[in-house]
Regions:
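N-terminal hydrophobic targeting/anchoring segments and the immediately downstream early-domain regions
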Residues: 1-168
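Ser/Thr-centered flexible coil motifs
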Residues: 6, 171-172, 194
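Second-shell residues forming the walls of enzyme active-site clefts
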Residues: 22, 194-198
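Alpha-helix-loop-beta-strand connector modules within alpha/beta enzyme cores
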Residues: 92-93, 166-185
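Catalytic beta/alpha-barrel core
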Residues: 99-101, 186-193
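Short, hydrophobic/aromatic alpha-helical segments in well-folded domains
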Residues: 135, 173-177, 197
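A generic "binding-loop/recognition-motif" signal
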Residues: 153, 193-194
Length: 198
């Protein structure tokens, strides 16, 4: 019975892309290789990052959200987020046979049918926009398709699950952020938010 279930799962994988919602490779590249793609080459096994092209393919990954995480206390969150997005864009150029940036659902399907991994960008923490709807819109134009509202700390507009509540959920500006994300078609990721924010 287990073999039959595995066969069904594999058949499903061939028809529908498995999309991994979070991969910290861009952060690992920043922290361990000074953003140098040659130092953590994805065509070779990467035991420290647990991510390489062979493993992604073997795991049946058809779509990958690359997390563009920056620390909540980063003094220049917009710049740091742009640098992380730049890493993802450079990955697409370095490995065009494996990855392509996907901006729409149709892109995901097309890339998957070509046997490549549809690559999407997820922002981990609303602090990345530095309380700017303009920054949010520009990140979307660069390919960000979800944003986690918080990470380990509150922002000026939303409470995190692991910080002392100051807003009891979303502020009026926080509601504007969510409305703008909905208008843009960005997923609102509730990981790390306080219960009141939900």
């Amino acid at each position: 019975q287990q073999d039959a279930l595995l066969a069904r799962a594999r058949a499903l994988h061939k028809q529908v892309p498995l999309i991994d919602g979070h991969n910290d490779y861009p952060w690992a590249l920043r922290e361990n290789a000074a953003r140098d793609l040659d130092k953590l080459d994805l065509t070779r096994p990467q035991p420290t990052t647990m991510t390489d092209i062979a493993r992604l393919k073997a795991g049946g990954v058809g779509g990958q959200f690359w997390s563009v995480y920056v620390a909540a206390d980063d003094p220049a969150p917009v710049t740091s987020t742009l640098e992380q997005i730049d890493v993802v864009h450079r990955m697409m150029r370095k490995y065009p046979g494996a990855f392509e940036l996907a901006l729409t659902a149709d892109d995901i399907v097309r890339i998957y049918k070509q046997g490549r991994i549809a690559s999407l960008i997820g922002m981990e923490g609303g602090h990345s926009i530095d309380s700017s709807l303009g920054a949010l819109r520009m990140f979307h134009r660069l390919g960000a398709r979800y944003m986690t509202l918080t990470h380990t700390r509150n922002t000026g507009w939303v409470d995190a699950a692991t910080d002392t509540p100051t807003h009891h959920g979303l502020t009026p500006f926080g509601l504007e952020v969510v409305r703008e994300m909905n208008r843009l078609g960005m997923l609102v990721d509730l990981s790390h938010v306080s219960p009141d924010t939900m």
